[in-house]
UniProtKB/Swiss-Prot annotation:
Keywords: ATP-binding, Calvin cycle, Chloroplast, Kinase, Magnesium, Metal-binding, Nucleotide-binding, Plastid, Transferase, Transit peptide. One of its GO terms (molecular function) is phosphoglycerate kinase activity. GO terms for biological process: gluconeogenesis; glycolytic process; reductive pentose-phosphate cycle. Pfam families: PGK (PF00162). AMP binds at K229, K233, G252, G324, E355. Monomer. Residues 1-28 form a transit peptide. Pathway: Carbohydrate biosynthesis; Calvin cycle. One of its GO terms (cellular component) is cytosol. (2R)-3-phosphoglycerate binds at A51, D52, N54, R68, S90, H91, G93, R94, R149, H181, R182. Its EC number is 2.7.2.3. This is Phosphoglycerate kinase, chloroplastic.
């Protein structure tokens, strides 16, 4: 309503006087990047690149979505264009020991096609045969090592195993954001033996947006948090409450907040053990002067199914036996108006059960609104998980400033945690003042 708009406008005016710094200005997170390395640093050097090539494969070993492979290409291209010898490492799936269906062999044709050269494939990731292939690599060549998780030592971050991996190369590039929150041999252990250890372009972009833009946003800064459970998003909400001006909540978690406020929620999803927490988060938002918006109306259903009967009711009027599965049209309008005032938005988690067409309107409306404000110059960040699927489904992914490729890694960064795979990298050179 009007009071909300006035509240936001008064905040906006108070920010106009503040200076804006460039995104990379977050000193604590500035890492040396592969872009800082020139041909003088790279020509003839063996570079161990840990990428995240964990792509989905069908039963015939065909790649069903090559997004992660495409995302790894800029870093590899920069290295080969500067005469490096690239030793590429990744995991795929969660193999228990050597498991042929988790081999990286099916990735070779697509990698070769995207790089415009024949990628050589090793049948192992350490040992004499691999060492021989490394010795034969020409400048600008690429060797793909076998799935690093075929060794249980990888996830144990075994120092002997890390040393064997590191012995293949002269320097290290981590471009695997999706596993940066894990201290494994190929993400953290190898950095103890290889200097410099630097961030790849993909990892760098994730840090620039999820840490840089969130720590030092163009304001007003809004966070949209959805998803079915408060429990999985507590850390994110608590961390973002410290930084954002507007917090919009949607998805199944809202019913825990409603119940905490004494409203009846019918048979909607509620986490009974999180009611006190919901109350304290509402109080914290008030104390911090954050405009926390909960949906004022919801789309309810008589069962959890695509063909359920549905109707729109005020949030305070959910009858027994009905469950809320999406935010309603009034909420979409209020949320959209709030987003129109913003300069930076981060979105993590859908507004409703968008897999069912009947309950997808809220999520789709948010995606379209983000496309609209993005085109007007706002910074829009999709913080991993189901929100990524949502913007892709609506066809607005191209318009977003940044779409995070991480699941757990994105959440941990948004929770304000340090990631082991990032901490292990060399600091950026001090910028001359």
């Amino acid at each position: 309503g009007a009071s909300f708009s006035l509240h936001v406008l008064s905040k906006i005016n108070s920010y106009k006087s503040q200076s804006t710094k460039p995104i990379r200005g977050v000193a604590s997170m500035a890492k040396k990047s592969v872009g800082d390395l020139t041909s003088a640093d790279l020509k003839g050097k063996k570079v161990f690149v840990r990428a995240d090539l964990n792509v989905p494969l069908d039963d015939s070993q065909n790649i069903t979505d090559d997004t992660r492979i495409r995302a790894a290409i800029p870093t590899i291209k920069h290295l080969i264009n500067n005469g490096a010898k690239v030793i590429l490492s990744s995991h795929l799936g969660r193999p228990k020991g050597v498991t042929p269906k988790f081999s990286l062999a099916p990735l070779v044709p697509r990698l070769s096609e995207l790089l415009g050269l024949q990628v050589v494939k090793a049948d192992d990731c350490i040992g004499p045969d691999v060492e021989k292939l490394v010795a034969e690599l020409p400048e600008g060549g690429v060797l793909l090592l076998e799935n690093v998780r075929f060794y249980k030592e990888e996830e144990k971050n075994d120092p002997e195993f890390a040393k064997k991996l590191a012995s293949l190369a002269d320097l290290y590039v981590n471009d695997a954001f999706g596993t940066a929150h894990r201290a494994h041999a190929s993400t953290e252990g190898v950095t103890k033996f290889l200097k410099p250890s630097v961030a790849g372009f993909l990892l760098q972009k994730e840090l620039d947006y999820l840490v840089g833009a969130v720590s030092n946003p163009k304001r007003p800064f809004a966070a949209i948090v959805g998803g079915s459970k408060v429990s999985s998003k507590i850390g994110v909400i608590e961390s973002l409450l410290e930084k954002c001006d507007i917090l919009l909540l949607g998805g199944g978690m809202i019913f825990t907040f409603y119940k905490a406020q004494g409203m009846s929620v019918g048979s909607s999803l509620v986490e009974e053990d999180k009611l006190d927490l919901a109350t304290s988060l509402l109080a914290k938002a008030k104390e911090k002067g954050v405009s926390l918006l909960l949906p004022t109306d919801v789309v309810i259903a008589d069962k959890f199914a695509a063909d359920a009967d549905s109707k729109i009711v005020p949030a305070s009027g959910i009858p027994d036996g009905w469950m809320g599965l999406d935010i309603g049209p009034d909420s979409i309008k209020t949320f959209s108006e709030a987003l129109d005032t913003t300069q930076t938005v981060i979105w993590n988690g859908p507004m409703g059960v968008f897999e069912f067409e009947k309950f997808a309107a809220g999520t789709e409306a948010i995606a379209k609104k983000l496309e609209e404000i993005s085109k007007k110059g706002a910074t829009t960040i999709i913080g991993g998980g189901d929100s990524v699927a949502a913007v892709e489904k609506v066809g607005v992914a191209e318009a977003m400033s940044h779409i995070s490729t991480g699941g757990g890694a994105s959440l941990e960064l948004l929770e304000g945690k340090q990631l082991p795979g990032v901490l292990a990298l060399n600091e950026a050179d001090p910028v001359p003042v």
